[in-house]
C-alpha cells in the first residue's frame, strides 16, 4: 500500500552532514535574494527617469529615446495575501522588462494597488475598523510577498487608488467628462463651455423649436445637462436590499442574486449617475483594428458593443408612438403583436382600465383588470436577472388591454408586457414576428396569437441552402427565401425587401434606417462608503453642480459606521440610504461656486470599483505631479504614438499590458472610453491606453470535495491506492478529486512564501515560467518545483565550487560545438524573451547548461553569456554569479549577449530518408550538398540498403534541407 501526501508539504533541503558547504540551497538562495534586493533598493536600480518633473534626470540630461512601458493589471490587496497563481503574470512581465532593460531600453515597470472595494468595507462593518486601516495592512503584506520575488519595479511610482493624491485626479477626470458633451458632427467630445457658446451665438439650435435666448436659467441648465457625457437618469438598476446597494450587471449572478453574499437582486428605477459611453460605440469598435490584442478579447468587445444595422419603426397608439428597432424590417407584415419591457415608460399610459369583452383568459395573468395584471406581473419578475429573463424557458407575459397600429398594413395588434424584453436594451419594445423568430413563436404559441409566414424557402435555386424548415406551424423559419403574405414585398428576396420596406417607412414618416448597439450607458454610482466621493453638490433646487478644480480633492469623511442601511433581502420596495449620508456635517456645506456663498448638499454615492483602474496607467507615468494628472511631455514620451516603430496607424498606449481575460470587456472597455475622452479634450496624445495586451492563463491545481460537495483543505488530503482521504474533525473520510483554478474558495491555495522558504524565489520564478506558454492555463505540482531548483544548482556549480566556494572559471577557448550551441541559445532566448515565450527560453537554457555540465566546460566565454541569459528568469542568482565572475556593476542594465551570425549557419544537415512514406534511415551531409550527392548518400545508408534488399527505386525525391523520399 502506498500513501502519498497530495498537498504542499515542505520540501526544504536539510543540511545533511554530507551536503557540500557551498551548495546552492534554499538557505543560500534566501541570503543571496535578500542581499541583492537590498542593493537594488539602495542603488535605485529600477528607477527610471521622466522627461520633465520630479523624476526627470537631476543633471538636466535628456531621457533615452528608446523606451518601453510595461504594465500589469494591478492587484486588489485582499486579506488572504497571494497564492502561487497570482505572481504568474507579474513574473512574466518582470522577465520581459528585465530582458529589454538589458538590451538598453529605458523601461518603466511599476505596480500599484486597486484598493477600493467591498471586502475591506465589509471587514470594517464587522469590526468597526476603518477600511483604510485594513487596506493599508494588506498592502504592506502584498508588498512583502511581491518583494520576495525580486520584481524590478520602480517603487517611487507605486500608489494605491485609495491614496487621496491619486483619487483627487480620479475626481478631476470625472469632472472633465461631466463638463464635456459629444459632438456627433465632429465625432468627438468637446467642453460644455463650447456648447454654451454656440447656443449663445445662435450657431447651434436648442431643438423643439425653442431659442436659447428665450430660455430661463433653469431651462438652459436642463438643455446643457441633457447633453453632458455624465448625466443623472431614472434608470432601471439592480437593487440589492440585503447589501443596501445598487449592483452592476457583472456583480449579479445568472440566477438573479448578488455575487457577494448571495442576496436577491431586484430590478427597479432609481436616480443614478450614468456615463454616456454609447456615444463612443463606433470609435471603440473601429480602433480595435489597430490594437495588438488577442482576437478573443477583440471579439468579446465587439459582441459587447453589438453594432447592428436595421430600421427604426413607429407603431401608433392612443398614448403616443411605440418605437422599435429591428434588423428585419422585411418581416413587418408578419408582426402580429407587440411586447414592451414591463418597466417601459409607456406601459402606465397605455394600460387599459378594463379588459376587452373577448379577451383570452391566457392573456390576463388571472387578474380582474389590466392594471392589476401589470402590477402583479411586475412583482413576479422583480427578482429576475437580465440573464434569467432572456433564457429560453417558458414564456410569460400580460396583455395590457391596448392595441398598436402596424404601419405596414394598418392592422391593430395587441400590446403585451413580457420579461424577455428588457428596458435597458434597444428601445425596450419589440415588434413580434412569430413566423420568423423562435422566441416570438414560443410566446405566440403559449398565448394563442396569430403566426404568419412571411419568408418562404426557395428550393429551386441550384446549390442554395435555404435552411431547414419553412412550416411556421411547427417552428419559426429564420432562413433566407422570398417574401410572401407581405403586400408590395411579395416575391422579393430578403435583402431587397429590407431595403424596400425601410424606404417605404421613411416615405410614410413611420420609420428610418438606423444603427443600434447592445452597449448601454455605464451606471456610475454605488451606495457604499469605501469608494471615491463624487465632486458634485446639489443646490436648493436639487440641481447638480460640478465642483471647481481648486476644491479637489473631496475626501472621504469619517462616519459613525460604514454600512449602508440594510433591508430585508426580499424587500423589493426599499430605497438606498448610503453610508455617506450619515456624515451630516460633511454632506451639508457652504460654498462659493462663483455666485456667492450658498448652502449645498454633497452627493452621497461613491464611484464604482472601476474608476481608478480606468486611468491608472497615466499616473505611473507621472506619479508625483501635483499640478496635473500627468504632464503632457511625460505622457507623450511613455505613451504617445510612434508610427516609425509601430506603423502609421499606431494609436499609442502602454507597450505591454498583461492581465486576466476576465477583464476583457468591463475594465478594458471603460479604460478605453475614459482615455478617448481625455484624448478628445487634449489631455493625452495617445488615443488608446494599451497598445498591446496579453492575457495570462490560470494556474490550476487539484481540489477535493466531501460527500456534500464542500471543499476540504487540499494540503491535508492523502492518497492511498488511487483514492483520496481527508482526516476531518469526525474522523477520516474519502473525498473526491477535481481540477480547477487555484484559490481560496477551492481550499487548494499554495502560498509563494512556502515555495520561497523551501527553494528560493528564483526557483519559483523559473518553475512558473517553465510550466507552459504564458497564455495557457497550467497545473501546479509542488513536487515538480525541485526540477527548477536543480537546474539553478547546475548553473551555480558551473561557476562556483560547492566544496570551496571559489570561482572555478577558466580562460579556455570554446570548441566548435559549444560555440554553435552558445550562439543558437543566445539567438533563441532573445527571440523567446521578446515574445514572452519564457517556457521555451528556459528549455534552451537548460539544454545549454546540460551541455556545459556534460562537457565539463569551465570557460568564461561560455559561462558569462549563460549568466546574462539566465538573469531575466533568475535575477538574484545571476547577479551573485556575475559578481563572483569579477563584475562590480549590476547586470540589470546588461548587456544581453548578442549572437554571432557565423555560428547560426549549420555546416551539415540531417536528412530523414523515407521509403514509400516511412522513415527507414537518416543521413548527414554538407549543408550545401547538391541533390545528387544527397540522393547518393541516402541510397548508400546501411539501413536503407537493407530495406531495399536489392530493389531499384522508381523515383528518388530530394526536398532540399528537409527529407529524401524513395519510391519503390
From Swiss-Prot:
GO molecular function terms here? aminoacyl-tRNA deacylase activity; ATP binding; leucine-tRNA ligase activity
Q: Which PROSITE patterns does its entry note?
A: AA_TRNA_LIGASE_I (PS00178)
Q: List its EC numbers.
A: 6.1.1.4
Q: What class of enzyme is it?
A: ligase
**Pfam name, any one:** tRNA-synt_1_2
Q: Where is this motif: 'HIGH' region?
A: 75-86
GO cellular component annotations, sorted alphabetically? Answer: cytosol
Q: Name one GO biological process term.
A: leucyl-tRNA aminoacylation
Cellular compartments annotated = Cytoplasm
Lyase in keyword set: no
Compositionally biased spans, kind Polar residues: 1-13
Predominant location? cytoplasm
Q: Does the keyword Aminoacyl-tRNA synthetase apply?
A: yes
The record's section on InterPro entries has: aa-tRNA-synth_I_CS, Leu-tRNA-ligase, Leu_tRNA-synth_edit, M/V/L/I-tRNA-synth_anticd-bd, Methionyl/Leucyl_tRNA_Synth, Rossmann-like_a/b/a_fold, tRNAsynth_Ia_anticodon-bd, Val/Leu/Ile-tRNA-synth_edit
Residue ranges of the region described as Disordered: 1-22
Q: Which reaction does it catalyse?
A: tRNA(Leu) + L-leucine + ATP = L-leucyl-tRNA(Leu) + AMP + diphosphate
Q: Which UniProt keywords apply?
A: Aminoacyl-tRNA synthetase, ATP-binding, Cytoplasm, Ligase, Nucleotide-binding, Protein biosynthesis
Where do we find the motif 'KMSKS' region here?
741-745
Q: Where does ATP bind?
A: 744
Fetch the PANTHER family from UniProt. Answer: LEUCINE--TRNA LIGASE, MITOCHONDRIAL (PTHR43740:SF2), LEUCYL-TRNA SYNTHETASE (PTHR43740)
Which NCBIfam families does this one have? leuS_bact (TIGR00396)
Q: Which family does it belong to?
A: Belongs to the class-I aminoacyl-tRNA synthetase family.
| UniProt-recorded name of the protein | Leucine--tRNA ligase
Species of origin: Mycolicibacterium vanbaalenii (strain DSM 7251 / JCM 13017 / BCRC 16820 / KCTC 9966 / NRRL B-24157 / PYR-1)
Q: Which gene encodes it?
A: leuS
Amino acid at each position: 500500500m502506498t500513501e502519498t501526501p497530495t498537498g504542499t508539504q515542505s520540501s526544504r533541503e536539510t543540511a545533511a552532514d554530507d551536503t557540500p558547504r557551498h551548495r546552492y540551497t534554499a538557505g543560500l538562495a534566501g541570503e543571496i535574494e535578500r542581499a541583492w534586493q537590498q542593493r537594488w533598493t539602495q542603488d535605485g536600480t529600477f528607477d527610471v527617469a521622466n522627461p520633465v518633473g520630479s523624476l526627470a534626470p537631476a543633471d538636466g540630461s535628456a531621457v533615452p529615446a528608446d523606451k518601453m512601458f510595461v504594465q500589469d493589471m494591478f492587484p486588489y490587496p485582499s486579506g488572504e495575501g497571494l497564492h502561487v497563481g497570482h505572481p504568474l503574470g507579474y513574473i512574466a512581465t518582470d522577465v520581459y522588462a528585465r530582458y529589454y532593460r538589458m538590451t538598453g531600453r529605458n523601461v518603466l515597470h511599476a505596480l500599484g494597488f486597486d484598493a477600493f472595494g467591498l471586502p475591506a468595507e465589509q471587514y470594517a462593518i464587522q469590526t468597526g475598523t476603518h477600511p483604510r486601516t485594513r487596506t493599508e495592512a494588506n498592502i504592506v503584506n502584498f508588498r512583502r510577498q511581491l518583494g520576495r520575488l525580486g520584481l524590478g519595479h520602480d517603487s517611487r511610482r507605486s500608489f494605491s487608488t485609495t491614496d487621496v493624491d491619486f483619487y483627487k485626479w480620479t475626481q478631476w477626470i470625472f469632472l472633465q467628462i461631466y463638463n464635456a458633451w459629444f459632438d456627433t458632427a465632429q465625432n468627438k467630445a468637446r467642453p460644455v463651455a463650447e456648447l454654451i457658446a454656440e447656443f449663445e451665438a445662435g450657431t447651434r439650435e436648442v431643438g423643439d423649436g425653442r431659442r436659447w435666448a428665450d430660455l430661463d436659467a433653469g431651462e438652459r441648465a436642463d438643455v446643457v445637462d441633457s447633453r453632458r457625457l455624465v448625466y443623472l437618469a431614472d434608470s432601471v438598476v439592480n437593487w440589492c436590499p440585503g447589501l443596501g446597494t445598487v449592483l452592476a450587471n457583472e456583480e449579479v449572478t445568472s440566477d438573479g442574486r448578488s455575487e457577494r453574499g448571495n442576496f436577491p437582486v431586484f430590478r427597479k428605477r432609481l436616480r443614478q449617475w450614468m456615463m454616456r459611453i454609447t456615444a463612443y460605440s463606433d470609435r471603440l469598435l473601429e480602433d480595435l483594428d489597430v490594437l495588438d490584442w488577442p482576437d478573443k478579447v477583440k471579439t468579446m468587445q465587439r459582441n459587447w458593443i453589438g453594432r447592428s444595422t436595421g430600421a427604426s419603426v413607429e407603431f401608433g397608439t392612443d398614448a403616443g408612438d411605440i418605437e422599435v428597432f429591428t434588423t428585419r424590417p422585411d418581416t413587418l407584415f408578419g408582426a402580429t403583436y407587440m411586447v414592451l419591457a414591463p418597466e417601459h415608460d409607456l406601459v402606465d399610459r397605455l394600460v387599459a382600465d378594463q379588459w376587452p369583452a373577448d379577451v383570452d383568459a391566457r392573456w390576463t395573468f388571472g387578474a380582474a383588470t389590466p392594471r392589476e395584471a401589470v402590477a402583479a406581473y411586475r412583482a413576479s419578475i422583480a427578482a429576475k436577472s437580465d440573464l434569467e429573463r432572456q433564457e429560453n424557458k417558458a414564456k410569460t407575459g400580460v396583455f395590457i388591454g391596448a392595441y398598436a397600429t402596424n404601419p405596414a398594413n394598418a392592422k391593430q395588434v395587441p400590446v403585451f408586457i413580457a420579461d424577455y424584453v428588457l428596458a435597458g436594451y434597444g428601445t425596450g419594445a419589440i415588434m413580434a414576428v412569430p413566423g420568423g423568430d423562435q422566441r416570438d413563436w414560443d410566446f405566440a404559441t403559449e398565448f394563442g396569437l396569430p403566426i404568419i409566414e412571411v419568408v418562404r424557402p426557395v428550393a429551386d435555386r441550384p446549390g442554395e441552402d435555404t435552411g431547414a424548415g419553412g412550416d411556421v406551424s411547427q417552428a419559426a423559419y429564420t432562413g433566407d427565401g422570398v417574401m410572401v403574405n407581405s403586400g408590395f414585398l411579395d416575391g422579393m428576396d430578403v435583402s431587397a425587401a429590407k431595403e424596400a420596406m425601410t424606404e417605404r417607412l421613411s416615405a410614410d414618416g413611420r420609420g428610418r434606417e438606423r444603427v443600434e448597439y447592445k452597449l448601454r450607458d455605464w451606471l456610475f454610482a454605488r451606495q457604499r462608503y469605501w469608494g471615491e466621493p463624487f465632486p458634485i453638490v446639489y443646490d436648493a433646487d436639487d440641481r447638480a453642480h460640478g465642483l471647481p478644480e481648486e476644491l479637489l480633492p473631496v475626501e472621504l469623511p469619517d462616519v459613525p459606521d460604514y454600512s449602508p442601511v440594510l433591508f430585508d433581502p426580499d424587500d423589493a420596495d426599499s430605497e438606498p440610504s448610503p453610508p455617506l449620508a450619515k456624515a451630516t456635517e460633511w454632506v451639508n456645506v457652504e460654498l462659493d461656486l462663483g455666485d456667492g456663498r450658498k448652502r449645498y448638499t454633497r452627493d452621497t454615492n461613491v464611484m464604482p470599483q472601476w474608476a481608478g483602474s480606468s486611468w491608472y496607467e497615466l499616473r505611473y507615468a507621472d506619479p508625483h505631479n501635483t499640478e496635473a494628472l500627468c504632464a503632457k511631455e511625460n505622457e507623450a514620451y511613455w505613451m504617445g504614438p510612434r508610427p516609425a516603430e509601430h506603423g502609421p496607424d499606431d494609436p499609442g498606449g502602454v507597450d505591454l499590458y498583461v492581465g486576466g481575460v476576465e477583464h476583457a470587456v468591463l475594465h478594458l472597455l471603460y479604460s478605453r472610453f475614459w482615455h478617448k475622452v481625455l484624448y478628445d479634450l487634449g489631455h493625452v496624445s495617445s488615443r488608446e491606453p494599451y497598445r498591446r495586451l496579453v492575457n495570462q492563463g490560470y494556474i490550476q491545481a487539484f481540489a477535493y470535495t466531501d460527500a456534500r460537495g464542500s471543499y476540504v483543505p487540499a494540503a491535508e488530503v492523502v492518497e492511498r491506492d488511487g483514492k483520496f482521504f481527508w482526516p476531518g474533525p469526525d474522523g477520516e473520510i474519502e473525498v473526491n478529486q477535481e481540477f480547477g483554478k487555484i484559490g481560496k474558495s477551492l481550499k487548494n491555495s499554495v502560498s509563494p512564501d512556502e515555495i520561497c522558504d523551501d527553494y528560493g524565489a528564483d526557483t519559483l520564478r523559473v518553475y512558473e515560467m517553465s510550466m507552459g506558454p504564458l497564455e495557457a492555463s497550467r497545473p501546479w505540482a509542488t513536487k515538480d518545483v525541485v526540477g527548477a531548483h536543480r537546474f539553478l544548482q547546475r548553473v551555480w556549480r558551473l561557476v562556483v565550487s560547492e566544496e570551496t566556494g571559489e570561482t572555478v572559471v577558466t580562460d579556455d577557448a570554446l570548441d566548435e560545438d559549444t560555440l554553435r550551441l552558445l550562439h543558437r541559445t543566445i539567438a533563441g532566448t532573445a527571440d523567446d524573451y521578446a515574445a514572452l515565450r519564457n517556457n521555451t527560453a528556459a528549455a534552451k537554457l537548460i539544454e545549454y547548461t546540460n551541455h556545459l555540465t556534460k562537457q565539463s566546460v569551465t570557460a568564461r566565454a561560455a559561462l558569462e553569456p549563460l549568466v546574462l541569459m539566465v538573469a531575466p528568469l533568475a535575477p538574484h542568482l545571476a547577479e551573485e554569479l556575475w559578481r563572483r565572475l569579477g563584475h562590480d556593476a549590476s547586470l540589470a542594465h546588461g548587456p544581453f549577449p548578442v549572437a554571432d551570425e557565423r555560428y547560426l549557419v549549420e555546416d551539415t544537415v540531417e536528412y530523414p530518408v523515407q521509403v514509400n512514406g516511412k522513415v527507414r534511415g537518416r543521413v548527414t551531409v554538407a549543408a550545401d550538398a547538391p541533390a545528387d550527392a544527397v540522393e547518393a548518400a541516402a541510397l548508400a545508408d546501411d539501413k536503407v540498403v537493407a530495406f531495399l534488399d536489392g530493389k531499384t527505386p522508381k523515383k528518388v525525391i530530394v526536398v532540399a534541407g528537409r527529407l529524401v523520399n524513395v519510391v519503390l
